[in-house]
Design a protein with these regions (language model features):
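Carbohydrate-binding surface patches
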Residues: 138-186
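Glycoside hydrolase catalytic-domain groove-lining segments
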Residues: 2-46
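Aromatic/acidic polysaccharide-binding cleft in carbohydrate-active enzymes
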Residues: 32-123, 130-137
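Active-site-proximal beta-strand/loop segments in catalytic clefts of secreted hydrolases
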Residues: 3-7, 36-40, 81-85, 169-171, ...
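Alpha-helical scaffolding within the catalytic cores
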Residues: 15-24, 61-69, 147-152
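Acidic, Ser/Thr/Pro-rich beta/coil linker or hinge segments at domain junctions
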Residues: 182-199
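Extended hydrophobic-aromatic, low-complexity segments
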Residues: 13, 44, 90-92, 167, ...
Length: 199
């Protein structure tokens, strides 16, 4: 089944509950789900709605949170954005500036482009999402600890070549330390990639 994530992102409680209801229904009928289109709309008030191009992390993190919830809670097997190039709106990964005669111009990238790349570049077709559990310092499991929609959100995947990928979204302004381990598997090395307003 294909669907769109428009108008399902606010309030935060609905972001998760709508996707969990969808997943329950999909599982009942043994149907897979592809999220085939979304962009920033007027109801996305947390980031000022869809008007005005934003190349910063504000929009990028907002969309990363939607991707995380679509994959983790709705079980989306594929995820697509609305369009690649746009004008003065939050709907393009790239912002185009053209002269009136359309003979010259420039293109500017956004952090949204790079956030999407953290998924599409590293999580390859055929990858399997792995379970994650968060624990406190004493080792006690924190229910839903892998998803704090205003803090850390984590998901992990194993590609068909055996490579592991972990996507960590840090929504809060404060620094947050965490450690991770992979049970039952020997990992020789990890390579980190960071997307931020500075990098």
């Amino acid at each position: 089944m294909a669907g769109h994530s428009y108008w399902t992102n606010t309030p935060l409680e609905a972001l998760r509950s709508i996707r969990m209801q969808l997943k329950d229904t999909l599982d009942k009928y043994n149907v897979q789900f592809w999220q085939t289109e979304t962009c920033i709309m007027g109801n996305d008030e947390e980031i000022g709605g869809g008007g005005g191009y934003d190349r910063t992390m504000k929009t990028a993190l907002y969309v990363a949170r939607i991707i995380h919830h679509d994959i983790v809670y709705a079980g989306a097997r594929s995820w697509q954005w609305w369009r690649a190039i746009g004008g003065d709106y939050k709907d393009g990964l790239l912002r185009e500036y053209t002269d009136p005669d359309l003979h010259d111009g420039k293109v500017e990238d956004s952090k949204l482009l790079w956030i999407l790349g953290n998924y599409s570049r590293f999580i390859r077709p055929g990858a399997v999402r792995m379970s994650i559990k968060a624990t406190d310092k004493s080792g006690q499991v924190i229910p839903e600890g892998d998803t704090d929609p205003q803090g850390l959100m984590c998901s992990a995947y194993q590609n068909t070549n055996g490579q592991w990928v972990m996507v960590v979204i840090h929504y809060a302004d404060q620094e947050k330390n965490f450690t991770f381990k992979v049970d039952g598997s020997k990992v020789k090395s990890w390579q980190g990639y960071r997307t931020s307003d500075e990098a």
